[in-house]
Design a protein with these regions (language model features):
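The feature primarily captures lumenal catalytic ectodomains
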Residues: 1-209
Length: 209
């Protein structure tokens, strides 16, 4: 698996809030300085999507950090056994998708996570999206802000049915841009700039000043 790195590791230093109560400093002490690791993406062939989880060779769970926000209690062995059981009991034949990109986890439907985590992961692969459209579950269509952002930023997207299984012949998978609750400065600024282009500003001209 060849990782394509798209950002460098750096240390994010935060300034203490000016209204911080000294008695509360212990609550934030670990947040003043954070290591932001290198971000990357890679390609895998014949990946199975089932219940918004990723499996290789039909049954074996991919590393959870690519589709889970919190991996502390994740057990890949148990998930793989469950996948084997479900495959033989239900026997539903997976449908096929030629190419796609994976940019979500189990928190991505949330406004905050979509606007920061997901859009940062999309920004990492902006030059690959025409060939590898992002894959999103149909349930995301119920979130108007997601549809509006996808349309506004013209992000190529393929929606899939969460009740079905899919073989992705070639899947481009992104790392998280930063740990939960943190941001990679390269990508969050790129996302910001996408929202203030002339194209986006044109949508505001009809509003009264």
């Amino acid at each position: 698996m060849k990782k394509n790195f798209v950002s460098e590791k750096y240390v994010s230093n935060r300034t203490m809030p000016i209204n911080l109560d000294p008695d509360h400093d212990i609550l934030f002490r670990n947040e003043y300085q954070k290591n932001i690791e290198k971000s990357y993406y890679f390609n895998l062939n014949n990946i199975l999507i089932a219940n918004n989880h990723l499996f290789k060779s039909r049954f074996f769970s991919l590393e959870p950090q690519y589709f889970k926000m919190d991996t502390e209690n994740w057990n890949s062995t148990l998930i793989s056994i469950k996948q084997i059981r479900d495959t033989f009991l239900k026997g539903n034949k997976p449908e096929s998708i030629e190419k796609g990109s994976w940019v979500i986890d189990d928190k991505s439907f949330n406004f905050f996570h979509f606007m920061t985590d997901v859009l940062s992961r999309i920004s990492m692969i902006e030059n690959e999206l025409e060939e590898y459209p992002i894959l999103l579950p149909n349930s995301f269509k119920n979130k108007n802000y997601i549809l509006e952002v996808l349309n506004l930023l013209q992000i190529p997207t393929v929606f899939y049915d969460e009740n079905k299984k899919y073989y992705i012949k070639e899947l481009l998978i992104t790392s998280h841009a930063a740990p939960a609750g943190n941001y990679n400065k390269y990508f969050i600024n790129r996302v910001k700039n996408q929202f203030i282009t002339d194209q986006i500003l044109d949508h505001k001209k009809s509003y009264p000043k």
